[in-house]
């Protein structure tokens, strides 16, 4: 029984933290002069809290694992909602495919060049060079 209560507490705490970040993001989105979705701002708040280790990651891990496990199911309503615009999508199918292809190509090129830049060969300079007597 004690183990079950502990598990329930972990899930409750994790979902509460995620929803508090979401609500804070939505409130901040209303105050900002630029249009950024509150859910994105909430994710950024959660990211900052986790990276600065203000919030321990084990506190949100149970709910994150649960949400990731059922992520595909969470996208079903969005897919059904897109079908309302079937006629418009069929009319614009060509430009949609071309823009997806070009944007994917651009992302792949940027990642490739960035990776080559980050992982380029660097000269290793030793702190002291040995002299003839030390060899």
Curated annotation (Swiss-Prot):
Membrane-protein topology: Multi-pass membrane protein
GO CC terms of this entry: plasma membrane
TM regions (residue ranges): 4-24, 30-50, 66-86, 93-113
InterPro entries: LrgA/CidA, Uncharacterised_UPF0299
Coiled coil: none
Primary location recorded for the protein, binned into one broad class: membrane
UniProt keyword terms in alphabetical order: Cell inner membrane, Cell membrane, Membrane, Transmembrane, Transmembrane helix
Pfam families recorded: LrgA
Entry's localization field: Cell inner membrane
Family affiliation: Belongs to the UPF0299 family.
Protein name: UPF0299 membrane protein YPO1514/y2654/YP_1404
Organism of provenance: Yersinia pestis
């Amino acid at each position: 029984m004690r183990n079950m209560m502990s598990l329930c507490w972990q899930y409750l705490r994790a979902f509460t933290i995620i929803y508090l970040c979401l609500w804070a993001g939505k409130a901040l989105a209303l105050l900002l002069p630029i249009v950024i979705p509150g859910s994105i701002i909430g994710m950024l708040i959660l990211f900052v809290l986790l990276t600065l280790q203000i919030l321990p990651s084990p506190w949100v891990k149970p709910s994150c694992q649960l949400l990731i496990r059922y992520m595909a199911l969470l996208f079903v309503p969005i897919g059904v909602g897109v079908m309302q615009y079937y006629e418009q999508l069929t009319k614009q199918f060509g430009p949609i495919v071309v823009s997806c292809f070009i944007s994917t190509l651009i992302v792949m090129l940027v990642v490739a060049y960035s990776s080559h830049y980050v992982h380029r060969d660097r000269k290793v300079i030793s702190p002291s060079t040995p002299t003839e007597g030390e060899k």
